[in-house]
Amino acid sequence: MASPYNAGEIEQKWQQRWAEWGLDKTPIASDLPKFYALSMFPYPSGNLHMGHVRNYTITDVIARLKRMQGYQVLHPMGWDAFGLPAENAAIERGIPPKQWTEKNIAQMRAQLQQLGLSIDWEREVATCAPDYYRWTQWLFLEFFQAGLAYQKEATVNWDPIDQTVLANEQVDSEGRSWRSGAMVERKLLRQWFLKITDYAEALLNDLEQLTGWPERVKLMQSHWIGKSVGAYLEFPIKDSQEKIAVFTTRPDTVYGVTYVVLAPEHPLTKVVTTAEQQGTVDEFVAMVAKESEIERTAEDKPKRGVKTGGIAINPFNGEEIPILIADYVLYEYGTGAVMGVPAHDQRDFKFAQDNNLPMQVVIIPDDADNSDVNLTVAYTEAGVMVNSAQFTGMASPKAKQAIIKFAEDNDYGRAKVQYRLRDWLISRQRYWGCPIPIIHCDDCGAVPVPTKDLPVELPDNVEFSGRGPSPLAKLEDWINVPCPSCGKPARRETDTMDTFIDSSWYFLRYADAQNTELPFDGEKVAHWLPVDQYVGGIEHAILHLLYSRFFTKVLADRQLIPVKEPFQKLLTQGMVQGITYKNPTTGKYVPAKDLQTGQQVIDPKDPKDPDSGEPLQVFYEKMSKSKFNGVDPQEVLAKYGADTARMFILFKAPPEKDLEWDDADVEGQFRFLNRVWRLVTDYIGDPAGIRFAVRPETLVTNEPLTKAEKDLRRAIHGAIKEVAEDLNDDYQFNTAISEMMKLSNALIAATDLISFPVYQEGIETLLLLLAPFAPHLTEELWHRLGRTDSIHQQAWLQVDPTALVLDEITLVIQVLGKTRGTITVPASADKTQLEELARNSDLAQRYLEGKTIKKVIVVPGKLVNFVIT
């Protein structure tokens, strides 16, 4: 009897040996074509979850496959290591963020290595390491020197009790601080921005080049950039030199403007508010300041506003119109002001009704009568201009351009393209982030830290209270420095950078991770970039992927790198979902373990709440701790081994689809690997693995192959062909595994009449196809077959077309179009021969006897149909 499959022992053995061999190191120089396989790097939370396992397994299979296909492969890993959780740990547990993060990295690195990932760990990066963020700061200064980094006032989430800025994720659904419970306010602070809007058009247009990206992701980015073509118009304020600027995509409606609205935060709010309205306006501004952006712009929420008492002039018709402030207008969007055209915009229509504002119709349908217009809803379609001075009677689409020209000729405004995309606010009032390398001098302004003084390192002597300003803002010894320009006393910038900055260039660092002189060498970037296959979740479709594209374009324009797009192909893997139990009455989630009481297991088809006895809803949902539906990868690895976990992840669903965790299917993959183990060890014929078979280098033999051998070779090369097609572009791992299962079944079913060379070819083919998927098992069996080199260094298999040629085929016999049965005929038979073979077959004779054949229809390789009378 063969030795049993001991996954844990085998996996530990080969992980150690691969590390000793340096099997996964990136080739330093090679004439082979390159392939850069990359997974989005993780935040080091301390433990892998199944989403991680899926992401990194997918990329690993691709990397292993490409090595076997003759590519030099770069497959690195690192850590997106700055962020709020480490700072929270410091507050809650008294653990310094650096210590907490490094411990988590070590733990997760070990877990990744247990998965058997073929990662070049010599290129590992951690964004919190000074030798990494030194170069993040260097790149920031490149943006600063290019005029792409600047400061301006911006609203932030402000905790009035803790006196600190909060990230969006620290504000709960009721608008309260996660820590103090206070209602969060909106407050203006001076913040750092990157001018991503300068690249809006390039980011939008170059989406067309990304043919290897999912259309869904490109559409999401296009919508996020949000290009609008329209007009910039200015409305003078009565009795003032100031003007209110608005952007509109409907300049054809300008004669229908009956009011203008400012964002409450707009600087002109103070200018236009009259003494009579000051109290009302102040009260409204204070109320809106407590609301989040999401609350203010929610579609289902009534739009609230108040009059300021100020008056604007519509320059097109000279009419005086009221100026209001409203919660739905945001200062950060566009100009921070909008023109109100209630007759032709539904939101304006409702707002005008609620605030008793007038309406003026200026466009009517082509077939409408202007004498009797009674609006019940806004008319938002194209039509004929009315009540619009010299533009009356003109078709509204044509009037758009005419009105823009009129505005330009009279200095009322101009044509303008606007984007929904806003400049990237990168300031964070946090400690655990990359320090912004700027020194503020009263005389010189914002002065960049000299390159020789980088990195500006995070100080260690920090107290974390969770209250007040950023911990860095309290360290006077760290803050107070001489100005690099004039030498006078100055102060360091105490904000740190958004962690998305760190992840916007890490893929460039992997190309040259040990460089101490530059963030990367341009020639090495030219060799490895763009990333050939990027793998990560759809949740990063906009921010991370857009910011990475932005960084790449800026660095290309700075002539630091030769590529303008970072990722050639993108695979967004689906979520891993767990079975979830929920009480529909209380909304409470119930852990699966609670469905068992003592030895009595509750019927899984009709589960009840163990507390109330109510029926539970059962469905699949993304794994999370709060829903009690997660599966710990470490438990799966301990029970089944990494190869089984990998196989299940790859087999259960196509990579871009959501995957429903199923213990029974995990068992199924474990059984399959056991079957492969027994198949090969039985073939070797020695349970101790002492007597090894010798691999023949050729199938040439003096004897012709038997039918059974030909059938097996056809199955072997059919599997090679199908797996190659499954892994060609779309990486359909699940169907590739199905083909391997078919081949294993063919090998198991093969009779003793199969010769040694043919069976050996089948065994080796199965192992080579399976190697990228189950690397440990296949390596062990490969060596038990007598090989001394790694299976992962073997060339990918090529199809032998002659093996796929059929000697015989099955031919369908039909009479009057009805199938009567099948016969076996030579595959080489032509139409005449097929007709003769069919006509003379016993099967056909039974139906043709005594009949007159009027016509014979022959479809070569498929059927013969007799038309009789």
Swiss-Prot record:
Enzymatic class: ligase
Organism: Synechocystis sp. (strain ATCC 27184 / PCC 6803 / Kazusa)
Compartmental location: Cytoplasm
CDD domains to which the protein is assigned, alphabetical: Anticodon_Ia_Leu_BEm, LeuRS_core
Pfam families: Anticodon_1, tRNA-synt_1, tRNA-synt_1_2, tRNA-synt_1g
Family: Belongs to the class-I aminoacyl-tRNA synthetase family.
Domain of life: Bacteria
Residues binding ATP, per UniProt: K625
Tagged with keyword Disulfide bond: no
Catalytic activity entry: tRNA(Leu) + L-leucine + ATP = L-leucyl-tRNA(Leu) + AMP + diphosphate
GO biological process, one term: leucyl-tRNA aminoacylation
Short motif 'KMSKS' region, span: 622-626
Single GO term (MF): aminoacyl-tRNA deacylase activity
Extent of motif 'HIGH' region: 42-52
Protein name per the record: Leucine--tRNA ligase
A single Gene Ontology CC term: cytosol
Record keywords: Aminoacyl-tRNA synthetase, ATP-binding, Cytoplasm, Ligase, Nucleotide-binding, Protein biosynthesis
Main location: cytoplasm
EC numbers on record: 6.1.1.4
InterPro entries the record matches: aa-tRNA-synth_I_CS (IPR001412), aa-tRNA-synth_Ia (IPR002300), Leu-tRNA-ligase (IPR002302), Leu_tRNA-synth_edit (IPR025709), M/V/L/I-tRNA-synth_anticd-bd (IPR013155), Methionyl/Leucyl_tRNA_Synth (IPR015413), Rossmann-like_a/b/a_fold (IPR014729), tRNAsynth_Ia_anticodon-bd (IPR009080)
PROSITE patterns noted in UniProt: AA_TRNA_LIGASE_I (PS00178)
